[in-house]
C-alpha cells in the first residue's frame, strides 16, 4: 500500500440490507459482493476534509497511521511550503501557520436566499522575526471568507449551488516514448521529465544517433553538455555511459571542454541575445531543476520517478530533481534505444525497459476538489508573498507588524476567481437526484492544465483496459466532449497520490480469502485477475480447472486456477452509478446504453414518483447517498409529523426536528419537494429514511413511471420513434411534473431619480392591476399568464420644458404629475402558472444589495405541466421518442380482460439499435406486476429451479424485482417464469409463455391478427418539453444595426429564412413571396410600418422598399473608400434615405413602435 496522508479513504457505509425500512426487492443476483459500494460522495467529501483538516479526518488518519504520525492538512501544507517569506537581504522573515476556521456566518438556506457565499472566516497565525534584533511579533491574521462544502458535497457561491468537478491530468513523472522516423523507418526514442510545477526536461535520440536534451521546450543541444554543466568530467561520463556507442559519439562531438563552457553554452541556448556569465548560467540551471521554489515534482512525481527508474525510496522527501535522476533517465533512454529489455538500477534492482502508454490510468491521476482549491490558494499566496517582500523593504523595521505586511486581497481574489469562473467549478445539475450525484462523481480531462477538446485525439478519448473498475466505459457525453468527461466507477476510490484504485478479492493457491486489496492500474498490471462470476464452493475453492482471466493490457486468457491472483468483487464493478441502474445492460448495445445512462439524468421529477418494477438493486443506494432524502441519525419515536417538518423523540430523550423543503426551485427549474414517509407514533431506527426527496419513492431512486407498453405499429402514428399515449395518463397526472421559474426585478437609482416599485402605473387599467397588492407586487396564489404584471415599477423619464398648465399641476399634485415610464416586470412570452413565492429585499431592511439598488423583488411562478404532444419520453435503454399522438382511452388496444395499454412503441425501434434490454425489461415488468409461482416438483421447471434463487419461487403480484447489471435474470429464467406467471382475478393468464398477448383493437373491437409483445416498461419524462421550445412571433424586437428580427426564443426572435431557403423559393419561382420575406417581413423599416397600417385599415399591401441591410452594406463598402452608388433604370444616382417623417407619423397614429430594437424592448419587458 502507498504511504502518506490518505486523500480519500473510503469509509465503509451502511449496507443496503442494513438500511432500516428499505423496501424488499426480489433479486436475480447470483454473485454476492463481499463489500458494499463505498460512500458515493466520498470523492468530494474526503478531499475537502483533507484540505481543511476536519477533526474527523484527523481522527481517521491517526487510526490509520498511529497516534504519533504527523498529520498535515492541505492548507497546512501550503503554509509550510510558503514559510518563511524573507526579505531580499535576509534580515527579516514572516511565517504563516495554524490555519483555523471560525463558525460559518450564514446557514445554507440564508446564503441561498441572500445570494451570498456559504463560507467560514479563515484565520492564520503570522509570526514576524527580525533576524538582526531577534525580535518576534506574532498575530492572528484574517485571510478571508473560505467557501465551505455542504454535507452533500456542493458549494453555495453567490446563492447558487455549485460543484467542483475532479480533473483527470497527466501525472508528474518520467515518460518514455517511441516514434518511427519517416525517412529511415527506424524507431526513435524520447523521454520527458514532467514536473508538477516548473520546466520540462526532454531527452531524445535523433536519426543520426545523437542524444540531445531540450530544457523548457527551447533549442536542442547534446546531452553531454548538460552532464558537464552539472559538474561531470569526461571520465565520469565515460565510466557511466561507456557501454553506449551513441553516448560516446555524442560526447566526442559536443564541442565543450569543461563545466564553465557547458554552463555558458546552455545559457546561450536558453536566453539567446543575453550576455552570459558563469554565475548567471549556474543560477539559471539551479533554478530550473534544483530549487524547490521554482521546481516541484510533488510527492506523486517523486513516487513515479522512483518507481519507473528503480531508485527506491531513499530520497522520498526530495521534490526536486537530482543528478542521479538525470543520469538514470539518460541510461534508461539509451538502453531502450539499443533494444534492451531490462536494466539494473543504481540500487541494484532489475527493472523492465519499456515505453509508456500515456493514456494508461497508471499515468493519469485525479486532481480532486481539495487539490484544485489548494492550487488556487497557492497562486493567491504567491502573489501575496511578492507584496510582503516589497513592504519589508519599504517599511520601518521597528514598526513592522504581521498585519501591516500582509495584504489578503490576492488570496481571496484567487479563491473567488476559481469558484466563480473556473471551468471546473460548475453550476450544479439539479435536474433530479441522480443527475446531482453523477455530477459530483464526474471526471473531466478538460480545464486549466488539462486537454482542450480541439486538440484531444481519438486515443485519449477511447476506452482503455486500465479504466476497468475505475472509470465507466459507458457514461460519457455525446458530442465534442465524448471520452473527455467520464464518471467514477461504482467501487472506485482515490489514493493519496490521486490515482484511482479499485478493489479485488485476494486468491491464494486457487482459494478465495477474505482479504480485499485496492489496486492502482499500475499494480493491477502485475497480477492475473479473474471475473466476479468465477465458480467457487462454500469453502472458497475455485471449482473450475481453468479460469477466464484478464492480463496486462486487457488481454483475455484461460489459465489454471492456481495461477489466479485476484478476482473482481462485483459484476457491476466496471460501471458507474448511472449505468448500474440500467437493467439488462448486458443485452444493450454500448451506444444506446450511453444514451440510457445520460437520459436518466434528464428525467424530470414527477408529481407522484413510482419505484420501477424492474430495478437493479442500485436505486436504494444511489438515493441514500445523493443527499436528497431526509435520514435520521438517531433512533426514537415520531412525535410530530406534518408536510413541513418531522419531530423525533430520540431514545436519549432529546428532540430532533427535521425541516422539509417544500416546492423550492432547483438550478434547472424543476421542483424540489420532500414528503414525509413516517407516521405519528412510529418507531424509527438510526439511518432510516423518514422523508422522500424529488424523484424518490420509499427511499429508492424513482425517476419515471411503470407503464403498460405494447410493441406494435399503429396507423403510422408511431413512425420514426414517435410514441402513442393513452389519454388516461394525461387525466390522472401520471406523467405530470411541476416546474418553477424565478423572476427578479430591482429598483435602482438613475440619473433622473430613483425607480419606484408601485401600483400606480401610468396608462394601465384596474383590470390589469387586480392581482397586485398595495405595494405593486403580485399576490401569492394568483394565476398569471404571459404579459401579466408581476411587479409594478416606474422609471423617471427625461424632463422636458413644462407648459404653465403642467407647472400648475405639478404645484398642486407634487411629484405624481412628473413624467415616468412603465418598466414593470411582466410574465415572459409563453409562460403561465401560479405565484407560489415572493421575496422582498430592500436597503431599508439592511439587506445586502448591489450598489445603486434600493429594492429587489423575486417572484416564483410554478407551472403544472401535463404530458402533451411534442414532449420527449425515454426508457432506460436509450429508447427515446416524442409523443406523437394522445389517443382516447377507448381507442387504445386492450387485453382480453379489458385492461387498456398505456403506451404504444414501434417495433422498428428495436432491431437495428440492438437495445434488446428494453424487451427483456418489458417481460420482467409484466412478471413483477402479475407475480409468479414456480412448482419445484413440476419436471418442466427442473432447469429453472436449478438457477433460480430459492426466494424467487413464489412472488406475489405487484412486487419489485432487481436484475443487477451483468448478473441479472437470464433469457431461460424469463421464459420459465413467463410460463409460470400468476393468472388475473378471473383466473386467466393474459400474457403467453413467449411474452406476447392477444390484443383487441379499441376502435373496432376485433382482435389483432398476430399476438403482440406486452409488459411494463419504466418510462422517463425528459426535460425536453415542448412548452419550452415552441415559439411564434408576429412583431417583436429588431437588431439595432441591420434592423432584422433577432433570433431565438429568449430574445422573442423570428425564424431565420436562410440562404438555402431563398434558393428553394427561387427554384419555385415564387418571386413575390421571396420579395416579401426579404423586405417587409424582415428589414424594410418604412415598408413594415406601412404594411402594418394597411392590415389594420384593411387596405392593399403596398410595394416593398429598400431593405436596411442593403443600406448597411453600401455604408460598409463606402467606409472602405469605395464609391458605390445605386443607379435608377435611366442611370441617374438614387438617394436611398427613406421618408422617416412619414413613417414615424404612421407608427405613432397606430400607437405602436414597430421598429423597436433590443434596448427599448428590454426596457418594456
Swiss-Prot record:
<dbReference type="InterPro" id="IPR015712">
    <property type="entry name" value="DNA-dir_RNA_pol_su2"/>
</dbReference>
<dbReference type="InterPro" id="IPR007120">
    <property type="entry name" value="DNA-dir_RNAP_su2_dom"/>
</dbReference>
<dbReference type="GO" id="GO:0000428">
    <property type="term" value="C:DNA-directed RNA polymerase complex"/>
</dbReference>
<dbReference type="Pfam" id="PF00562">
    <property type="entry name" value="RNA_pol_Rpb2_6"/>
</dbReference>
<dbReference type="Pfam" id="PF04565">
    <property type="entry name" value="RNA_pol_Rpb2_3"/>
</dbReference>
<dbReference type="InterPro" id="IPR007641">
    <property type="entry name" value="RNA_pol_Rpb2_7"/>
</dbReference>
<dbReference type="InterPro" id="IPR007121">
    <property type="entry name" value="RNA_pol_bsu_CS"/>
</dbReference>
<comment type="function">
    <text>DNA-dependent RNA polymerase catalyzes the transcription of DNA into RNA using the four ribonucleoside triphosphates as substrates.</text>
</comment>
<dbReference type="Pfam" id="PF04563">
    <property type="entry name" value="RNA_pol_Rpb2_1"/>
</dbReference>
<keyword id="KW-0808">Transferase</keyword>
<dbReference type="InterPro" id="IPR014724">
    <property type="entry name" value="RNA_pol_RPB2_OB-fold"/>
</dbReference>
<dbReference type="GO" id="GO:0006351">
    <property type="term" value="P:DNA-templated transcription"/>
</dbReference>
<dbReference type="InterPro" id="IPR007645">
    <property type="entry name" value="RNA_pol_Rpb2_3"/>
</dbReference>
<dbReference type="Pfam" id="PF04561">
    <property type="entry name" value="RNA_pol_Rpb2_2"/>
</dbReference>
<dbReference type="GO" id="GO:0003677">
    <property type="term" value="F:DNA binding"/>
</dbReference>
<dbReference type="InterPro" id="IPR010243">
    <property type="entry name" value="RNA_pol_bsu_bac"/>
</dbReference>
<keyword id="KW-0548">Nucleotidyltransferase</keyword>
<keyword id="KW-0240">DNA-directed RNA polymerase</keyword>
<dbReference type="InterPro" id="IPR007642">
    <property type="entry name" value="RNA_pol_Rpb2_2"/>
</dbReference>
<dbReference type="InterPro" id="IPR037034">
    <property type="entry name" value="RNA_pol_Rpb2_2_sf"/>
</dbReference>
<dbReference type="InterPro" id="IPR007644">
    <property type="entry name" value="RNA_pol_bsu_protrusion"/>
</dbReference>
<comment type="subunit">
    <text>The RNAP catalytic core consists of 2 alpha, 1 beta, 1 beta' and 1 omega subunit. When a sigma factor is associated with the core the holoenzyme is formed, which can initiate transcription.</text>
</comment>
<dbReference type="InterPro" id="IPR019462">
    <property type="entry name" value="DNA-dir_RNA_pol_bsu_external_1"/>
</dbReference>
<dbReference type="InterPro" id="IPR042107">
    <property type="entry name" value="DNA-dir_RNA_pol_bsu_ext_1_sf"/>
</dbReference>
<dbReference type="InterPro" id="IPR037033">
    <property type="entry name" value="DNA-dir_RNAP_su2_hyb_sf"/>
</dbReference>
<comment type="similarity">
    <text>Belongs to the RNA polymerase beta chain family.</text>
</comment>
<dbReference type="GO" id="GO:0003899">
    <property type="term" value="F:DNA-directed RNA polymerase activity"/>
</dbReference>
<protein>
    <recommendedName>
        <fullName>DNA-directed RNA polymerase subunit beta</fullName>
        <ecNumber>2.7.7.6</ecNumber>
    </recommendedName>
</protein>
<dbReference type="GO" id="GO:0032549">
    <property type="term" value="F:ribonucleoside binding"/>
</dbReference>
<dbReference type="Pfam" id="PF04560">
    <property type="entry name" value="RNA_pol_Rpb2_7"/>
</dbReference>
<keyword id="KW-0804">Transcription</keyword>
<dbReference type="Pfam" id="PF10385">
    <property type="entry name" value="RNA_pol_Rpb2_45"/>
</dbReference>
